[in-house]
């Protein structure tokens, strides 16, 4: 297997940085959309393991994330239209994979925040992928999101979109961690594996406060997700842990699974791992989870084995 850097220039002048893990005889592609306040390189071990099993993996960093992101832009998508920009970035990554490796089925895995980016992508570009895998996602809780939007908009009105609010961080990540008191670190909610938690805590590209603007974009993006508008023949697979605070300890993930199924999607699956916290891919039983992801990547839908020549939406200026 070989590894190559990925560098793509977007129409609005942004540079997408990532990495490709290319086995000698790939049978499928997996594009990974990472979560908030982390980066694509955290999936390197998974990517290498999947590569050893003939899955071509592409990881990349969202805007405002990753080691190449300037400090002044960390945790911030864009001053305008941030959500659509990150969705279009993902579309560009997928199209690059399609063009470089024609004929291979493309699976999209989105984790946490990245799972919602992936859902927005599927809503707009669903015919471009063969399967959607959602890791550590949650239901679209509209009343809660609308209340959060009021608070975030108030802070933005006073402090500006680029302000990094510790209050929002405490109300989200801090709340998640309180479920695991007494806490050893501020990130115990991520995994039962203390080594994985310590690696996250020590990583300067992880755990930072995001801008109020990113939170505005994120909330608006989540509110725009409507599974009833997705392509019905797109397979959707949800995986989470029963102790994932983001997924409401399994409750929210189950509800989202039910919503997607009732929306008419023909193939929807849910896998809950007992006792697992937010990052199932970094959990104590991660090899079991990796094997499950490998199994999903090897499932090919003949109706989606080739990319369809659909026009892509124009990227925002």
Indicate residue ranges for each PLM-predicted region.
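Active-site glycine-rich loops that stabilize anionic/oxyanionic intermediates
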Residues: 27, 34-38, 112, 242-243
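N-terminal cap/lid segment of alpha/beta-hydrolase-fold proteins
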Residues: 1-22
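Alpha/beta-hydrolase-fold enzymes
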Residues: 118-205
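Conserved alpha/beta-hydrolase
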Residues: 45-73
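Catalytic active-site module of serine/aspartate enzymes centered on a nucleophile-bearing elbow/loop
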Residues: 263-317
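Alpha/beta-hydrolase fold nucleophile elbow
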Residues: 101-112
